[in-house]
């Protein structure tokens, strides 16, 4: 049974056992574009990926299922070499406040593509991690500070979104996955915390 057949079974909930780890060649492959109309499997896969992210951010479900928290997941991380990503960034507000919207960014993207980006680069001050990497890799992961992304939804409708800050970093991380790139490829090997002129450090 293929990974997509197993994962899209009605009763299946994606867990850490479904996520492949660094060293698996699927993580280094250029994933295939999906064609429209999507297959039922491809639609269900996107929904299951989003369900996993919601479970991973729910303390009760995460503990019950042994999940690491995640804000993004790409199909290649499930050993499925397709250009499908899911992103789920919670709205962070001051303690005691309730956000109007639970999520700052919530999307299942088919064939996402960066169509333009800022000259300025940015990196998360605390570095990045990945559900497919079980070790800590310190260093600044240098990315574009702002990006414009085109993608299709499950109905084949095209969307264009402009992203900055943390949302921009998350989507770039996931698009890297469908292009066979790992986050640590973008860390300066000789000086992991090198700061070149104009680099925006996001805290």
Curated annotation (Swiss-Prot):
Sorted UniProt keywords: Hydrolase, Iron, Metal-binding, Protein biosynthesis
CDD domains named among the record's database cross-references: Pep_deformylase
Family: Belongs to the polypeptide deformylase family.
NCBIfam families: pept_deformyl
Protein name listed in UniProt: Peptide deformylase
The protein's Enzyme Commission number: 3.5.1.88
Residues at the active site: 174
Xref: Pfam families: Pep_deformylase
């Amino acid at each position: 049974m293929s990974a997509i057949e197993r994962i899209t079974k009605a009763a299946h909930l994606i867990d850490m056992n479904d996520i492949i780890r660094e060293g698996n060649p699927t993580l280094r492959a250029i994933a295939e574009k999906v064609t429209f109309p999507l297959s039922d499997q491809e639609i269900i896969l996107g929904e299951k990926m989003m369900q996993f992210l919601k479970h991973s951010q729910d303390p009760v479900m995460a503990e019950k299922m042994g999940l690491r928290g995640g804000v993004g997941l790409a199909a290649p991380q499930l050993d499925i070499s397709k250009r499908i990503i899911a992103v789920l960034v919670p709205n962070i507000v001051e303690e005691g406040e309730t956000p109007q919207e639970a999520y700052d960014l919530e999307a299942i993207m088919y064939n996402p593509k960066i169509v333009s980006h800022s000259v300025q680069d940015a990196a998360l001050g605390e570095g990045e991690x990945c559900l497919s990497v079980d070790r800590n890799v310190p260093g600044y992961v240098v990315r574009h500070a702002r990006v414009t992304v085109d993608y299709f939804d499950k109905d084949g409708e095209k969307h264009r979104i402009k992203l900055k800050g943390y949302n921009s970093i998350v989507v770039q991380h996931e698009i890297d996955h469908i292009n066979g790139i790992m986050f640590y490829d973008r860390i300066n090997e000789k000086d992991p915390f090198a700061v070149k002129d104009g680099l925006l450090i996001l805290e």
